[in-house]
């Protein structure tokens, strides 16, 4: 804020007095004298006359920072960048300010942009120290892919709207993104998100993403702070168009929120490679550990991704083997499946600040278990083991500290420990802890336990070892890959045997000390930098290899069979040995080639006036056929005029259809070359209004059926004998 002196000067300027004065020289004089407030006033006067002077905005930001007016300084530096984005000096000044104000990832985003805008720019020692020792490692030898990798994190954005602390998949995403910022990599990796019901992809600004990573790293992180940033990200992110040779890679939980089918179809039809990081196949192989209310949706999304992906990365060799088996048995499909193993890094300590009250409440000795409290994690075994230990050793039994939020299928366990008064205080449950607190618990426990029935990897096992602490883990699924010979293993189904293994280091402290020393001496952790490097290299190599492979989108439809496009039910509970009947129908949606939103229960809405459908038949080319499509106009119109057209043969039929219920529209045409049938469905009336503000809706398609001309009467009888509800 200007004082009376500054106000008086502005008044004179507006009156035309002093416009020829050299305010820059005056500002420099004040700056050299250490009078930063007056220097800022002089620069502000100069900018009143020349608001487009980027260098002056930079100088104003610097003197404001010297005057401890950080908020004003940041605004001035951003104004300088807005005017001249290619000038690195302003970005470097802003990076320093952001770093010194506790926003290290925002600072890294600015350093990154400075290097991208000027390939000859060299960071000085001060900035290298701020950016960190690994930031420039890949500047010279970073391998560029001749396309771009678009990394989808839609699930992470949705997750952070409801959760303060990321665990599991979302923690992996945050660690990969954070490492991507910490090491300068060329501009071939772009983070994006999708909106449900739309096939459009949106680019996330690097600095907005960095601000989100900064927010998640703070000890006082809050959902409210996340939501403010997420709202800005969703508002400011711009739609982008991917090009042939690019890669669309889904980094997170693809079954949360987003129906990717139309996005995958659109991308693959334009020569874009689709990859996905699969963390486990638990919904497929161990469906008892998935909430029944979500199981059908989750299994359907797994089917869509497995059918649509060109290549797959997995977080363990165990998951890779499962994925290959499911692809072969369920789909008769073979695509590249590569293991990109996760890290052993401990949780980031954030600012390292821990309230003394937290430390004071901890027991002097404790065993630690870090994971969501849910049925799959097998906390019931731990309760039974600690009950046995307490019965034998009484108060000598160390406390079991469970760290994690309450999840699904754990109600009986929760009720039991509450009724037992948490085993007379020998079990403690802590939730919503900062990374610094979790790190403290790891480093001060006796050892950790992780008895899970099934995992895709097992982050807590690696975190324990990385903190120099022994771990007793389940011998199931991927867990032996994480800890190797340094971990002691238990059968998650054998409580009696597990109790003996857990009791040994508790009662034999010499054994525990020797085990701990062995881990400190021998363990070599895999870092998130290693993971990110391998992941990017694998994605690039998979895309390069895919250029020479067959990537057909063709869907085979048989005559006289109704193919529906709604969210089809899938077979539940049969695991890998399930028949194709459940997932087979979901392949129908891959016939919806362009111009479609995601599937709903009844079918799909077209996203533009003309939408395409394409499938193959085993009938010879030139065979005369009738194609019937069940369609409906979009609300709120009462009627709509719809055209069904054969793209290859230029045959068309037009019908006026009531919006009250779907109706069949028929087209006589011929099978095209290579057995293809290519259709267009078009809404041609122009008087309709849109019912939804965020989606354009035109025609709804529920089903398609075709038959040879001579079989049309029989097909009509079949349709008439079947209610619309049954086939729609």
Task: Indicate residue ranges for each PLM-predicted region.
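Helix-start (N-cap) detector for alpha-helical repeat units in TPR-like alpha-solenoids
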Residues: 20, 54-55, 88-89, 122
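Carbohydrate transferase catalytic cores enriched for Leloir-type hexosyltransferases
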Residues: 22-28, 32, 62, 66, ...
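Short beta-strands within extracellular/lumenal beta-sheet-rich domains
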Residues: 598-620
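A short beta-strand element within beta-rich, extracytoplasmic domains
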Residues: 613, 619-638
């Amino acid at each position: 804020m200007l004082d009376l002196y500054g106000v008086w000067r502005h008044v004179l300027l507006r009156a035309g007095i002093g416009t020829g004065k050299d305010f820059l020289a005056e500002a420099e004089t004040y700056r050299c004298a250490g009078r930063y407030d007056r220097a800022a006033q002089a620069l502000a006067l100069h900018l009143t006359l020349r608001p487009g002077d980027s260098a002056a905005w930079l100088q104003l930001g610097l003197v404001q920072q010297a005057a401890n007016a950080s908020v004003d300084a940041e605004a001035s530096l951003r104004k300088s960048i807005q005017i001249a984005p290619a000038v690195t000096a302003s970005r470097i000044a802003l990076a320093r300010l952001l770093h010194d104000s506790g926003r290290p990832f925002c600072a890294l985003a600015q350093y990154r942009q400075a290097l991208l805008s000027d390939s000859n720019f060299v960071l000085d020692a001060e900035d290298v120290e701020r950016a960190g020792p690994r930031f420039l490692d890949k500047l010279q030898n970073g391998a560029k892919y001749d396309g771009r990798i678009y990394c989808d994190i839609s699930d992470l954005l949705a997750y952070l709207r409801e959760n303060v602390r990321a665990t599991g998949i979302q923690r992996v995403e945050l660690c990969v993104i954070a490492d991507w910022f910490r090491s300068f990599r060329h501009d071939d990796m772009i983070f994006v998100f999708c909106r449900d019901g739309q096939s459009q992809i949106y680019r996330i600004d690097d600095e907005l993403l960095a601000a989100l990573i900064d927010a998640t790293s703070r000890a006082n992180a809050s959902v409210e702070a996340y939501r403010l940033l997420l709202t800005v990200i969703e508002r400011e992110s711009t739609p982008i168009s991917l090009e042939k040779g690019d890669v669309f890679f889904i980094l997170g939980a693809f079954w949360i929120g987003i129906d990717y089918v139309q996005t995958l179809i659109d991308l693959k039809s334009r020569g874009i490679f689709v990859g996905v990081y699969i963390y486990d196949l638990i919904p497929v192989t161990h469906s008892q550990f998935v909430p029944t209310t979500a199981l059908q949706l989750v299994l359907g999304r797994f089917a869509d991704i497995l059918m649509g992906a060109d290549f797959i990365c997995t977080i363990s060799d165990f998951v890779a083997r499962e994925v290959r088996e499911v692809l072969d048995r369920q789909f008769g499909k073979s695509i590249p499946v590569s293991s990109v193993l996760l890290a052993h890094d401990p949780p980031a300590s954030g600012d390292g600040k821990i309230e003394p009250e937290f430390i004071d409440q901890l027991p002097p000795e404790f065993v630690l278990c870090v994971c969501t409290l849910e049925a799959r994690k097998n906390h019931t075994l731990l309760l039974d083991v600690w009950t046995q230990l307490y019965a034998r050793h009484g108060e000598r039994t160390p406390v079991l500290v469970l760290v994690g939020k309450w999840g699904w299928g754990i109600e009986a366990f929760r009720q039991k420990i509450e009724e037992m008064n948490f085993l007379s205080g020998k079990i403690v449950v802590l939730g919503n802890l900062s990374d610094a607190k979790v790190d403290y618990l790891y480093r001060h426990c006796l050892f950790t336990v992780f008895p899970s029935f099934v995992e895709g990897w097992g982050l807590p096992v690696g975190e324990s070892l990385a903190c120099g602490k022994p771990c007793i883990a389940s011998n199931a699924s991927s867990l032996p890959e994480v800890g190797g010979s340094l971990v002691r293993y238990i059968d998650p189904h054998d409580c009696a045997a597990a109790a003996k293994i857990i009791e040994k280091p508790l009662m034999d402290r010499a054994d525990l000390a020797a085990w701990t020393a062995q881990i400190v001496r021998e363990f070599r952790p895999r870092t998130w930098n290693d993971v990110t490097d391998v992941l990017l290299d694998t994605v690039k190599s998979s895309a390069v290899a895919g250029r020479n492979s067959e990537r057909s989108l063709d869907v085979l439809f048989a005559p006289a069979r109704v193919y529906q496009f709604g969210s089809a039910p899938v077979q539940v509970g049969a695991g890998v040995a399930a028949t194709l009947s459940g997932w087979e129908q979901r392949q129908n949606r891959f016939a919806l080639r362009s111009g479609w939103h995601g599937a709903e229960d009844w079918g799909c809405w077209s996203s533009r006036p003309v939408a395409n459908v394409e499938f193959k038949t085993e009938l010879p080319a030139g065979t005369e056929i009738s194609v019937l499509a069940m369609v409906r106009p979009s609300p709120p119109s009462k009627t709509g005029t719809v055209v069904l057209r054969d793209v290859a043969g230029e045959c068309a039929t037009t019908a006026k259809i009531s919006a009250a219920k779907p109706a069949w529209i028929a087209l006589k045409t011929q099978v095209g070359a290579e057995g293809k049938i290519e259709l267009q469905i078009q809404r041609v009336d122009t008087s309709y209004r849109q019912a939804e503000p965020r989606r354009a809706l035109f025609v709804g398609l529920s089903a398609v059926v075709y038959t040879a001309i001579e079989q049309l009467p029989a097909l009509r009888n079949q349709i008439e004998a079947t209610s619309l509800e049954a086939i729609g």
